[in-house]
């Protein structure tokens, strides 16, 4: 599928396009279209699905989740449509660009979300089985421990592992994708640093817990 290198100009254009797609702030767009408060003004102030859910509108949160995941998948799909036979290196850079677009969106002054849904969309574009295994990991941890952040961190940690040991990855060719996934994992941990501190302190909110 992905095997040849496009021109430097085309590669740069695909990477830039992926960043712009990743920068689309679905949390803000969906909230505005549905007449809700800007998610950057309440809760964690994070423009993501979890914070939109704090508005009490589950439909808006679901649409935000789907939108954020879709842009991760779409950026990679579009790159492959525009440049058939895309090299693994450019493919990996496009994935990183889309993810960084969500974390540091040009449309929101480079202050974006944490990237969980967008990362899932990227995994789906790489391989549906990889996305399924990672999502299943999230669900298992969330059900047993009731911490959304912990589930995201554990799932993010295992995503590169699943990629490494799943479906006979040819590292001489597909290594850049594995490196990109490792970088995405590190960035996810960095964006969740406040959650990690609360988990260690025992003050992180559990899923379904009512605020006092």
UniProtKB/Swiss-Prot annotation:
Q: Cellular location of this protein? A: Cell inner membrane
Gene Ontology terms, MF aspect: acyl-phosphate glycerol-3-phosphate acyltransferase activity
The main location class comes to membrane
Q: Which UniProt keywords apply?
A: Cell inner membrane, Cell membrane, Lipid biosynthesis, Lipid metabolism, Membrane, Phospholipid biosynthesis, Phospholipid metabolism, Transferase, Transmembrane, Transmembrane helix
Q: Which InterPro entries match?
A: G3P_acylTferase_PlsY (IPR003811)
GO biological process terms, semicolon-separated: phospholipid biosynthetic process
Topology of the protein relative to the lipid bilayer: Multi-pass membrane protein
Q: Name one Pfam family in it.
A: G3P_acyltransf
Q: Name one GO cellular component term.
A: plasma membrane
Stated EC number for the protein is 2.3.1.275
**Record field: transmembrane:** 8-28, 59-79, 90-110, 122-142, 148-168, 169-189
Q: In which pathway does it act?
A: Lipid metabolism; phospholipid metabolism
Reaction(s) catalysed (UniProt annotation):
an acyl phosphate + sn-glycerol 3-phosphate = a 1-acyl-sn-glycero-3-phosphate + phosphate
Keyword check for Metal-binding: no
Q: Which NCBIfam families match?
A: glycerol-3-phosphate 1-O-acyltransferase PlsY (TIGR00023)
Function of the protein? Catalyzes the transfer of an acyl group from acyl-phosphate (acyl-PO(4)) to glycerol-3-phosphate (G3P) to form lysophosphatidic acid (LPA). This enzyme utilizes acyl-phosphate as fatty acyl donor, but not acyl-CoA or acyl-ACP.
Q: How does it assemble?
A: Probably interacts with PlsX.
Similarity remark: Belongs to the PlsY family.
Query: What protein name applies here?
Result: Glycerol-3-phosphate acyltransferase
Top-level taxonomy: Bacteria, Pseudomonadati, Pseudomonadota, Betaproteobacteria, Burkholderiales
Q: Which gene encodes it?
A: plsY
């Amino acid at each position: 599928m992905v095997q040849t290198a496009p021109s430097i100009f085309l590669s740069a254009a695909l990477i830039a396009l992926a960043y712009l797609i990743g920068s689309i702030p679905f949390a803000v767009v969906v909230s505005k279209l549905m007449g809700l408060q800007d998610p950057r003004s309440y809760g964690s102030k994070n423009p993501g699905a979890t914070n939109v859910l704090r508005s009490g509108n589950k439909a808006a949160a679901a649409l935000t989740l789907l939108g954020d995941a879709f842009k991760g998948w779409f950026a990679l799909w579009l790159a492959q449509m525009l440049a058939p036979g895309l090299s693994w290196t450019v493919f990996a850079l496009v994935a990183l660009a889309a993810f960084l677009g969500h974390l540091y969106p040009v449309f929101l002054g480079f202050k974006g979300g944490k990237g969980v849904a967008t990362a899932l969309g990227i995994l789906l574009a790489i391989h549906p089985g990889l996305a399924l295994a990672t999502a299943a990991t999230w669900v298992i941890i969330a059900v047993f421990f009731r911490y959304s952040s912990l589930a995201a961190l554990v799932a993010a940690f295992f995503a590169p592992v699943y990629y490494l040991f799943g479906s006979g990855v040819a590292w001489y060719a597909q290594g850049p994708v594995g490196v990109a996934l490792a970088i995405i994992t590190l960035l996810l941990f960095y964006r969740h640093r406040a959650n990690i501190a609360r988990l260690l302190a025992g003050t992180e909110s559990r899923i379904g817990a009512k605020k006092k």
